[in-house]
Amino acid sequence: METRSVKRKKKKKEEEANWFIRVDRISNLPDSLNHQILLLLPLKSAAQASLLSKRWRSLFLSLPDLDFTSINDLKNPKSFSSNSIYKVLSLRSHRDSNNLRSLRFRVPVTFTSLNSLIRLAVTHQVQDLDIEVTTKDYFNFPRWIVTSQNLRALTLKSANLGFRLPPSSSARGGFQKLTSLSLSRVILHNQPCLSDFFTDPSFPLLEKLTLECCFGLKELKVSCRLLQEFSLKNSLQLEGLEVSGNKLQKLKVESCFYSYSEKSFVKINTPNLKTFLWNSNAVTTSVHFLDKLVCLRKAFVKVFWHHQDLNSQIQSLFTLLSGLCHSYKLQLGNQSVEILSSKKGLLKNHLLPFHNMRFLELQTRLNRHNVQTLSCLFKSCPMLNILTVKIIDDQTSERRQWNKDLWDMSNSEIQYWESQAYELESFLNHLEFVEIHGFVECENEMSLAIFLLRHGKALIKMTLRSSFLCRDSLRRQMIRSQLTGFSMASSKAKISFH
């Protein structure tokens, strides 16, 4: 039989246990911590939590970040609509402490609904707006965005048809706080020359600009004093590009200048540029660097040419490469090497030396007519440490099987390389790592590999990565023994096969 003392202790323990169960410790946390908890959940789960109590409803309606992309799907438009977003925004309080930091959504929408959503977001002083919309017609750039005094970052993308930019006169004086801007599928047939749109009066604080799929754009000038990153992609009709900015550090232009205009031009005035990416663009008629790119660290050039006015295109490519002569790292695409290998290429032009170059990557077919070009490029890189050669395999390439007896032929490629040893002395004294991709044990790549092994005094490692077409293990073993059989200039050199 329990005593009164034992009963009291037992009852006290039960009351303490019930108290722990009844107390909602999470709800009593500060709003900032509860917001962090809700932000870790998908928005749909956070909305469901708001049904628990008035406290959680208030927390949900005061979330600083709303990401509706986690609950909607453009491929299934019936699963979500702009009305749902509008209702959530409408229920929010307009207190200063309840401002909207960021809003993201992907939704099919009419222009009227889109304008209402953006107006409501601007009313809540949104700072970061990231939206992608599907519409049944072209639409105009929402004017509420232009006049917002709180917007810091904007991403506007049309998933199908596109939108029109406001006139330059309307943009001037707007976007005063914007630091990041990304626009995709812009319709510019009525204003093909944007020479005074992306300038300081309209974008005094802009640091990052991304433009993609600008239809009808022919000439573009970007001149914002605080701009640090600029990317332009898929503007096929572009004929002229002018970029200037003392703080610009990264410039990326991809898939542009497809109009084949005889007056196409590029002007670059970015003295502090560190990264230059020029990918899949047609060679322009002229290139002008108004300042030396002495801060350049990385450059990538992949171009293609059209069969009109070849002389100006070749000269344009040389001007482009010469403007990149201060780069630490350079990657050249296959067409760039082919243009340099043309009859009017390197034989009649001279590249400025790349004294700062430490890393060089070349994409090439490695045909016989490429050999002199490679030699000239190596001469232009006297301090190079790392060389990567990616061999492009196609049906038109001359790929003769390697035969060790070719060493004795006076007209073989290896003899040409041997004749270049003196002029390549500095290059050979600094080269440490070589990697050849697409190695199929043909004469072209074997001649290059043997030459670098025989004369590379600083060589540490040569990596040969075979093409998937070459999996003959017996032949690979024979090639390995032949390569190691030649006397190497460096006692540290090792050969790795993959």
From Swiss-Prot:
Keywords noted in UniProt: Leucine-rich repeat, Repeat
Cross-referenced Pfam families: F-box, FBD
InterPro entries: F-box-like_dom_sf, F-box_dom, FBD, FBL13/AtMIF1-like
LRR repeats: 148-172, 175-200, 235-259
Record domain F-box: where: 23-71
FBD domain segment(s): 416-466
Protein name from the UniProt record: Putative F-box/FBD/LRR-repeat protein At4g03220
Species of provenance: Arabidopsis thaliana (Mouse-ear cress)
